[in-house]
Design a protein with these regions (language model features):
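Catalytic active-site module of serine/aspartate enzymes centered on a nucleophile-bearing elbow/loop
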Residues: 3-40
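A short helix->loop->beta-strand "cap" motif at the edges of active sites that frequently abuts
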Residues: 4-6, 76, 311
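General small-molecule cofactor/ligand-binding pocket signal
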Residues: 8-10, 177-179, 314-316
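Nucleotide/pyrophosphate-binding catalytic subdomain
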Residues: 41-303
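Internal nucleotide-binding/catalytic subdomain
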Residues: 255-257, 315, 320
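Long, charged amphipathic helices and adjacent flexible linkers at domain junctions
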Residues: 277, 319-324
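Acidic/polar loop patches that form or flank catalytic/metal-binding clefts of enzymes
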Residues: 299, 310-317
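Acidic-aromatic/histidine active-site loop/patch
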Residues: 306
Length: 324
């Protein structure tokens, strides 16, 4: 099926082994819906992943709201996955460094708070800021921190981004709900670069998604997860793209759209090589090879969940409406 451009396929997960297709009627009905009801194939959810630059104050957030509004106006089912806003992850890492070195981190913390609350008219982040302050105070006291503590601190970047986007969408009449992936994506306890437990995670993501009202837009936090004790873990640097690919796979999405500040994938870094050309289309194997060789727009683990479900990945520029 993967080798044929006009063929798609889906998996049936079951405890019934090879006879699953005879017993899992509901899953089979979903897979066959696109054949007997062609309009059902069109209605597949699109997963939209927004990077940090897209969620920055000013034009970035405005463009994201426009994109989401246009999708809803077209009655396209969507699910959103967000990274930390702008350079929030770097700021949080710096706060940890300052606190652990016994330096005064409060001015940097105040700057972080001001930057994150700029687009908001209500104090919806007060609890998050209080929790962050308490953790930093503890780090300053012992002048050290573990990878577990670092994951806790970094998680505020994605949590704040998701809460901010939910608030702004709601202000525009677009009902949205935060889905905190720490309650959904389960991992081992390898803090800083945790491995996902696919079966547990898929079950939790599907359950949360299917419980939403039809018109509600789910906003998933990228990058963060939790072990089975409920302790916060992260999926590695740039792991938000991996989160988006996992969620697209779990939801059997029609497409994963990665919105960023560049037009797509180029033959070389256009910032370093002015003659670099945009690549119109790549096979999964080519994209995976690029990821393994360090293409920054891709995460090396991102491609595999998409290959397994034959889900296209489209790289789009948030700031160019005609970008394809």
């Amino acid at each position: 099926a993967q080798s044929q451009s006009n063929v798609t396929y889906g998996e049936i997960t079951s405890v019934h082994g090879h006879d699953a297709f005879l017993l899992e009627f509901e899953q089979l009905e979903v897979l066959l819906a696109g054949i007997f009801k062609p309009q059902a194939a069109v209605a597949k959810v699109q997963v939209l992943k927004f990077g940090g630059t897209s969620l920055a104050n000013g034009e970035g957030l405005s463009k994201v709201i426009e994109i989401v509004g246009a999708k809803k106006a077209a009655q396209q089912p969507i699910a959103l996955v967000v990274s930390a806003r702008d350079n929030a992850t770097d700021q949080l890492e710096r706060l940890l460094a300052l606190a652990s070195q016994g330096q005064d981190y409060h001015p940097a913390l105040d700057f972080f708070k001001a930057q994150q609350t700029t687009p908001l008219k209500e104090p919806i982040l007060a609890h998050d800021f209080e929790q962050l302050s308490q953790i930093l105070a503890g780090v300053a006291l012992i002048k050290d921190y573990s990878e577990k503590t670092k994951d806790q601190v970094l998680s505020f970047g994605e949590l704040i981004a998701a809460k901010t986007l939910v608030y702004l969408l709601s202000q525009q009449g677009l009902g949205a709900q935060l889905l905190d992936t720490r309650a959904l994506i389960k991992t081992n306890s390898d803090f800083g670069n945790a491995s996902v437990k696919d079966a547990l995670s898929k079950k939790a993501v599907l359950s949360a998604y299917e419980a939403l009202e039809p018109q509600i837009i789910p906003v998933f936090t990228g990058f963060i997860a939790a072990n089975e004790k409920g302790e916060t873990t992260t999926l590695g640097r740039n792991g938000s793209n991996y989160s988006a690919a996992l969620i697209a796979s779990f939801l059997d999405a029609g497409e994963l759209q990665n919105f960023t500040h560049v037009d797509g994938i180029y033959t070389a870094d256009p910032n370093l090589v002015p003659e670099a050309e945009k690549i119109a289309a790549l096979s999964y194997s080519e994209a995976n090879e690029l990821a393994n060789f360090g293409a920054t727009i891709l995460h090396a683990k991102t491609i595999i969940p998409l290959i397994e479900k034959n889900i296209p990945l489209r790289i789009l520029n948030t700031f160019k409406a005609d970008n394809e």
